[in-house]
Amino acid sequence: MNVTALNLIPGQLSLAQLRAIYQQPVTLRLDDSATAQIEASVACVEQILAENRTAYGINTGFGLLASTRIASEDLENLQRSLVLSHAAGVGEPISDALVRLVMVLKVNSLSRGFSGIRRQVIDALIALINAEVYPHIPLKGSVGASGDLAPLAHMSLVLLGEGKARYKGEWLEATEALKVAGLTPLTLAAKEGLALLNGTQVSTAYALRGLFEGEDLFAGALACGGLTVEAVLGSRSPFDARIHAARGQRGQIDSAAAYRDLLGESSQVSQSHQNCDKVQDPYSLRCQPQVMGACLTQFRQAAEVLVVEANAVSDNPLVFAAEGDVISGGNFHAEPVAMAADNMALAIAEIGSLSERRISLMMDKHMSQLPPFLVGNGGVNSGFMIAQVTAAALASENKALAHPHSVDSLPTSANQEDHVSMAPAAGKRLWEMAENTRGILAVEWLAACQGLDLREGLKTSPKLEKARGILRDKVAFYDKDRFFAPDINAASELLATRCLNELVPANLLPSL
């Protein structure tokens, strides 16, 4: 696997870099420009302690216990106790890729110099990242305010020599994991435990994974939709640039252009029916630019929110070293992330819903002008009959999963934290939705290629022929019924490799 080398200038991560960090290991170096601000924030914390001033998160308790002053001799124990007590997550461990993304996001935030955390602690996180040592972070346990406390506590445990981490696929006790990275357990100073735990990095990583998978699905859906247009002898007219310019919706305009690029001006298939008597295609064909354009807009808007959050300081309290102030606020509240994830859920659901309708269209011989269920000798053979049912089941699941999470809230911490974002749940359900939509698109890809193969050897456009060839290298034509599930799985696995992304125009999607 390739390793991305990254000189991190705090607050300047791009979406393309974030995608690369998620997809492959990274060798991280913190730019020298970060040092002065980091040291200034630490000096500010030390000055507050030297002057015996009371400051939340530095020498007080936390949450509802914020008014409790902590004695100087207990400050180190306070930070350690905070990490241990807050490591209360449950569920399966998240993937190495997600842990890596979380850790880089945390380093990026802490290195902005508003957190009062020593360079030594930040460097320890970087050493773990570079050694590909990934702390055990359970999937569940955060409500997205006050930050992602439980999962980030699990991440931080390893720095203290507690918990466990994965290295080359094997779980190690924390002390052994630290040795792999050339580290020994840390003793956290005042403010440092809270700085590690407070923040929206897990929520943001969950949503970023949803964005990346959503973008890949979008690209795949464009190709599959184009193949279906050709398979059912659809018209190119609805993709005419003048239609979309008249409306002015940028996502729609760009999606229509992508379809025109995929379909080309004409093909053997389109020439075969240019004098037909059809007036209009069904909406699932004709309105693809409108529906997919709206989805593209959601991804683009979510990307804008998430790249800001990936570079944000979401700690609390914040240290403003120049003024000598430590101020409590609410940057840990992940509402922007939750809403971005909710909007992406709508887009992922609609991509699948539209695809399922195109599959259904291909099943109907009156609409498609193809054999019923895309197979010869109907009756003996059932063809794609139940594959379409599977697609319908997946589309239906996504409709329920698309329910917004950001409108939900449960008060926590004895009502001190009385409104929360539910951003982690909003983000992680995107992965299940993406898997469902990938399954739907897999069925459409299979069906559209089958339909084209039934068109007596006629060829479509060069790009769509490439999409057909990629599938046909793995899955053969259906001349009669066979065990169907392996073919759906094969097509879905192909989609997961992002093999159709290269067929869409560059810069169409935010992180590609």
From Swiss-Prot:
Q: How is it modified after translation?
A: Contains an active site 4-methylidene-imidazol-5-one (MIO), which is formed autocatalytically by cyclization and dehydration of residues Ala-Ser-Gly.
- A molecular-function term among this protein's GO annotations: histidine ammonia-lyase activity
Q: Which UniProt keywords apply?
A: Cytoplasm, Histidine metabolism, Lyase
**Entry keyword rRNA-binding:** no
Its Enzyme Commission number(s) read: 4.3.1.3
User: Which cellular component terms (GO) are annotated to the entry?
Assistant: cytoplasm
Q: Which reaction does it catalyse?
A: L-histidine = trans-urocanate + NH4(+)
Checking SUPFAM superfamilies in the record gives: L-aspartase-like
The pathway that the record names for this protein is: Amino-acid degradation; L-histidine degradation into L-glutamate; N-formimidoyl-L-glutamate from L-histidine: step 1/3
- What's a GO biological-process term for it? L-histidine catabolic process to glutamate and formate
Where does the record put the 5-imidazolinone (Ala-Gly) cross-link? A145-G147
Q: Name one Pfam family in it.
A: Lyase_aromatic
Subcellular location field? Cytoplasm
* Main localisation: cytoplasm
List residues modified as 2,3-didehydroalanine (Ser).
S146
Q: Please, which domain of life does this record's source organism belong to?
A: Bacteria
Annotated family: Belongs to the PAL/histidase family.
Q: Which PANTHER family match?
A: HISTIDINE AMMONIA-LYASE
> What protein name applies here?
Histidine ammonia-lyase
Organism of provenance: Pseudomonas fluorescens (strain SBW25)
